[in-house]
């Protein structure tokens, strides 16, 4: 039996204070995928998060607010972003920190 092929994505970046920052995460047709967000900053929380998906990478669904785990305190992770039986090309995760922070984002899908 062949091993499944996994799609992976990882990025660490700073969020400027009060600026909504979008991350286009390549899901590339994976049926099941999970995104984990970690606030790697020292003090400031992530204060807002939304997710939208695109079938072909051009048109996106309406952004859905992620409320569970938000605000995301410094040094903690949010692992509730899951696409189950939801194939798409791109997931657009938008994060905001009122005071600025640093985040790491990882995704795996199959």
Question: Predicted regions span which residues?
Answer:
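Beta-strand signatures of extracellular beta-sandwich domains
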Residues: 34-36, 50-52, 104-106
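Non-cytosolic beta-sandwich-type ligand-binding/adhesion modules
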Residues: 41-77
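Noncatalytic modules at the cell exterior or secretory-pathway interfaces
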Residues: 29-37, 83-102
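A generic structural motif
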Residues: 38, 54-56, 96, 108
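Transition segment at domain starts
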Residues: 1-29
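Tight coil/turn sites that cap or link beta-strands
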Residues: 18, 74-75, 88
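Edge beta-strands of jelly-roll/beta-sandwich modules across compartments, strongly enriched
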Residues: 46-47, 99-110
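Exposed aromatic-hydrophobic patches
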Residues: 21-25, 77-84
């Amino acid at each position: 039996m062949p091993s499944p092929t996994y799609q992976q994505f990882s990025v660490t970046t700073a969020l400027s204070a009060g600026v909504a920052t979008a991350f286009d995460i390549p899901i590339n047709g994976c049926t099941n995928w999970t995104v984990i967000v970690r606030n790697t900053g020292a003090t400031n929380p992530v204060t807002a998060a939304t997710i939208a998906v695109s079938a072909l990478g051009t048109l996106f669904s309406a952004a859905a607010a992620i409320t569970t785990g938000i605000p995301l305190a410094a040094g903690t992770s949010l692992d509730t972003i899951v696409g189950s039986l939801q194939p798409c090309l791109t997931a657009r995760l938008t994060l905001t920190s009122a005071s600025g922070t640093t985040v790491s984002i990882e995704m795996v899908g199959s």
